[in-house]
UniProtKB/Swiss-Prot annotation:
Functional note: Component of the ubiquinol-cytochrome c reductase complex (complex III or cytochrome b-c1 complex) that is part of the mitochondrial respiratory chain. The b-c1 complex mediates electron transfer from ubiquinol to cytochrome c. Contributes to the generation of a proton gradient across the mitochondrial membrane that is then used for ATP synthesis.
Positions contributing to a ubiquinone binding: 201
Binding site for heme b b566: 97, 196
Extra facts: Heme 1 (or BL or b562) is low-potential and absorbs at about 562 nm, and heme 2 (or BH or b566) is high-potential and absorbs at about 566 nm.
Chief site of localization: mitochondrion
GO terms under cellular component: mitochondrial inner membrane; respiratory chain complex III
Originating organism: Artibeus cinereus
The protein's assembly and partners: The cytochrome bc1 complex contains 11 subunits: 3 respiratory subunits (MT-CYB, CYC1 and UQCRFS1), 2 core proteins (UQCRC1 and UQCRC2) and 6 low-molecular weight proteins (UQCRH/QCR6, UQCRB/QCR7, UQCRQ/QCR8, UQCR10/QCR9, UQCR11/QCR10 and a cleavage product of UQCRFS1). This cytochrome bc1 complex then forms a dimer.
Name the record gives this protein: Cytochrome b
Length: 379
């Protein structure tokens, strides 16, 4: 008799995706982040659902409702901090996942890669709108600054901003619609994840060597399920440590002050995971130019497959490209640091230099290095 998991219409889909899926035998721990992202998404949806039961999306009561969750709701403080710090873990895993794709050449699966970029934008939009909901000072002013960037769009910019605001400033209408979209978007993200996996399973996984692994495959279960469970334990331990020992480590103290449109905080900045893009935005004096650079800092990932000049897929055997990759990582850390600093000397020039380097490495230095490495292969 055939096993039910191979014949049942629903179970056979799960079976072919997570049980009998042929996987390359050489996958390293860098391939754990896909499943970790799935866990992060699950944690965020569950904690968010329970938070939404107690939250009120009204400017008069939003801040107090978050206080009420932390003080009066059973384990409300735990839900709130799991959700806030879960977002940080989500972005850590997300950036490591993208970095793995860049390093090992996974971007050559263009459909999977492009859906991944869409996912990145969707998660960033969700996180931004979620940051506005507690209605603290940084929530209000962050929303004001970021939504105002749309006014840089020629002709329709100002009307577009007022349409998003639902008035002439960030207020009740804006908060309500941000809550609605913040609730909806994770489910759209879940649907996109399904499409992402669908395209991935059409081609099969890449592997660290970057060479076809068809002759050497192993079943996903039990080998990679055990490996993934270890990853879950490590990540959830890190998240629990962060939540229980220093829940406000990654937050902004200004967000414990209720939103006040008449008092501007000395330094308006987004959450830490957007600081690299914020630094690129600030490094260009022109408003429209800054907005374009901000969008391009993420959208540039879409042209990475076109810029792949190497005869080898992975960077595993390309030491020159490896040096450039780690330089790019250092530049991103520098941009993240600069994004949190005030706009003054020497931070301005450091930010501008790092921004130029960021685009220069991806657009010119990496393709040129690949060509040089191809030439060296002939020796």
């Amino acid at each position: 008799m055939t096993n039910i998991r191979k014949t049942h219409p629903l179970l056979k889909i799960i079976n072919s995706s997570f049980v009998d899926l042929p996987a390359p035998s050489s996958l390293s721990s860098w391939w754990n982040f896909g499943s970790l992202l799935g866990v992060c998404l699950g944690v965020q949806i569950l904690t968010g659902l329970f938070l939404a039961m107690h939250y009120t999306s009204d400017t008069a009561t939003a801040f107090n409702s978050v206080t009420h969750i932390c003080r009066d709701v059973n384990y409300g403080w735990l839900l709130r901090y799991l959700h806030a710090n879960g977002a940080s873990m989500f972005f850590i895993c997300l950036y490591l996942h993208v970095g793995r794709g860049l390093y090992y050449g996974s971007y050559t699966y263009s459909e999977t890669w492009n859906i991944g970029i869409l996912l990145l934008f969707a998660v960033m939009a969700t996180a931004f709108m979620g940051y506005v909901l507690p209605w603290g000072q940084m929530s209000f002013w962050g929303a004001t600054v970021i939504t105002n960037l749309l006014s840089a769009i020629p002709y329709i910019g100002t009307d577009l901003v007022q349409w998003i605001w639902g008035g002439f400033s960030v207020d009740k209408a804006n908060l309500t619609r941000f809550f609605a979209f913040h609730f909806l978007l994770p489910f759209i993200v879940t649907a996109l994840v399904m499409v992402h996996l669908l395209f991935l399973h059409e081609t099969g996984s890449n592997n660290p060597t970057g060479i076809p692994s068809d002759p050497d495959m192993i079943p996903f279960h039990p080998y990679y399920t055990i490996k993934d469970i270890l990853g879950f334990l490590v990540m959830l331990t890190a998240l629990a440590t962060l939540v229980l020992f220093s829940p406000d480590l990654l937050g902004d103290p200004d967000n414990y002050i209720p939103a006040n449109p008449s008092i501007t905080p000395p330094h308006i900045k987004p959450e830490w995971y957007f600081l690299f893009a914020y630094a690129i935005l600030r490094s260009i004096p022109n408003k429209l130019g800054g907005v374009l650079a901000l969008v391009m800092s993420i959208l540039i990932l879409a042209i990475v497959p076109i810029l792949h000049m190497s005869k080898q897929r992975s960077m595993m055997f390309r030491p020159l490209s490896q040096c450039l990759f780690w330089l790019l990582v250092a530049v991103l850390f520098t941009l993240t640091w600069i994004g949190g600093q005030p706009v003054e000397h020497p931070y301005i020039i450091i930010g501008q230099t790092a921004s130029i380097l960021y685009f220069l490495i991806i657009l010119f230095l990496m393709p040129m290095t690949s060509v040089v490495e191809n030439y060296l292969l002939k020796w």
